[in-house]
Regions:
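Conserved AMP-binding/adenylation subdomain of ANL enzymes
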Residues: 1-34, 49
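Gly/Ser/Thr-rich phosphate-binding loop
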Residues: 7-10, 33-38, 48-109, 121
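AMP-binding/adenylate-forming catalytic core of the ANL superfamily
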Residues: 29, 36, 144, 149-150, ...
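Alpha-helix capping/helix-boundary segments
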Residues: 41-43, 71, 147
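Active-site glycine-centered loops adjacent to acidic/histidine catalytic or metal-binding residues
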Residues: 68, 92, 114, 129, ...
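Short Gly/Pro-enriched turn/cap motifs at secondary-structure boundaries
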Residues: 111-116, 131, 161-164
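Conserved beta-loop-beta connector loops within the AMP-binding
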Residues: 123-141, 175-178
Length: 205
């Protein structure tokens, strides 16, 4: 992420302190960035701070991107109402070195992770590796040119994660009729109730 701004002649703001709501709010107000990347937890914390303070800083943001965990729809809507700009929620991984599933500027649907980014393919499979139908929860697999080859000196993990050109993300998703993907949880934290996958994440929401 640090090299992307440089590739288009932009500047990056580096902060070596702890990213608290106070410190990040100060940076936004002081340096007036036009693009802001954060995790949902920090977006929520900033909203809480500004609501408590009674005002948000005036920042010329033209793009806000969230990753690292699923963005709760309520946080996205509150941010848009307060700041006048959507949060572009996306999904990436260390293994893929890039965001491969994302909403788009002007085409944001909160509560979903959007659609596949150009250059990447995604599919959902069941426990036997068969593709699942629309509306059925399955594990997300992705392939694209940025994928890692393996885990250094971790043969067993490599075999579990990389299947030919496809990388298993460990994330459970549901695909809508419109082709958007809804996050349902991790494969290692979901459980079945009467044959149906249940996600702690969905229950919490």
């Amino acid at each position: 992420g640090m090299s992307f701004p440089l590739s288009v002649g932009a500047s990056s703001l580096l902060f070596n302190g702890r990213p608290t709501p106070d410190s990040v709010s100060h940076i936004l107000e002081t340096y007036q960035p036009t693009v802001y990347y954060g995790v949902p937890t920090l977006f929520a914390a900033l909203l809480h701070k500004w609501e408590t303070d009674g005002a948000a800083p005036q920042v010329p943001l033209r793009c806000c991107t969230s990753a690292g965990e699923a963005l709760p729809a309520e946080i996205g809507r509150k941010w848009r109402d307060l700041m006048g700009i959507d949060i572009i929620d996306g999904v990436g991984s260390t293994e893929m070195l890039h965001i491969f599933l994302s909403n788009r500027p002007g085409d944001v649907q909160y509560g979903t992770s959007g659609t596949a980014v150009p250059g990447y393919e995604v599919r959902l499979v069941d426990e036997d590796g068969a593709e699942v139908s629309t509306g059925v929860v399955g594990e997300l697999l992705v392939r694209g040119g940025s994928a890692a080859a393996d885990y250094w000196n971790q043969r067993d993990k490599t075999r579990r994660t990389f299947e030919g050109e496809w990388t298993r993300t460990g994330d459970k998703y549901e695909r809508t009729a419109a082709g958007r993907f809804i996050y349902c949880g991790r494969t290692d934290d979901m459980f079945k109730v009467s044959g149906i996958w249940v996600s702690p994440f969905e229950i919490e929401q």
